[in-house]
């Protein structure tokens, strides 16, 4: 059941625009907006929260909220830089919503929240004395204490020490389930999105390019632009395959390419002769770069497969792959 509906949302400033955004977000869903820097992720969150004006329609259930103030929309927002009030201590920051939502005051819920987030010992601390991870938990507590209908998270892990990121990601997932939240989370990190999301929307240059489950979006990009953003390797024109196809481009997984020293080997559906440009030995595999005419193939091969393989730069080599392993774009 859709709890948040966005129709034809448009916003323009200077040379940037959000272009006719349509989204349906279901009750209890962890929805991730995934895109590169400058793609409009944060701007879209701000328009949903009412912090930035836009045209189009935003509904919560059957209620139109696009004409309401941020306070009236009842949406919790955790900013990338946390946006905590430096003149208030931790406890005062968390309870700030009591100033405009008198009915929210609840000692029992407050106590449960600070125990869940393990911040009881921080309540009287000034904000300036907190670490990045502590600020993040306080910002989460403030958003949750307001008992908002929807929680918006803007790159919540960007200011966190990498050592604690997994711990925070795990906690976000647990909080989402524990408090039965509907969450919209902005990130540029694929692993973060894959771990957290029920559904992912790819946003590039202000446009929603693809929406689906993490498996569908991350393993089946709809077009070349999405594939490049997702870091797909070995994207080539289908003309090199010399077959009839409606597709212009294809990609082949580096782990599914075979190599042969004997240039007469043709055990795969497609094979190409090239020259080794570079090779790098890793812990348990080899990274190999092979130039085939104007194309550069990246190949990953387990060390165990290469026991009798002599490797050197400028060496001629044959590479091959099967039709079933091709992903068309």
Model-derived features: where do they sit?
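Glycine/charge-rich catalytic "coupling/switch" loops of P-loop NTPases
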Residues: 234-235, 239-280, 304-329
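ABC ATPase NBD coupling module
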Residues: 64-79, 100, 221
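Conserved ABC ATPase signature
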Residues: 126-130, 134
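Conserved ABC ATPase "signature" region
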Residues: 64, 105-122, 173-174
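ABC-type ATPase nucleotide-binding domains, specifically the catalytic core motifs of the NBD
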Residues: 14, 53, 68-69, 88-107, ...
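A short, proline-enriched helix->beta-strand linker immediately N-terminal to the Walker B motif
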Residues: 145-149
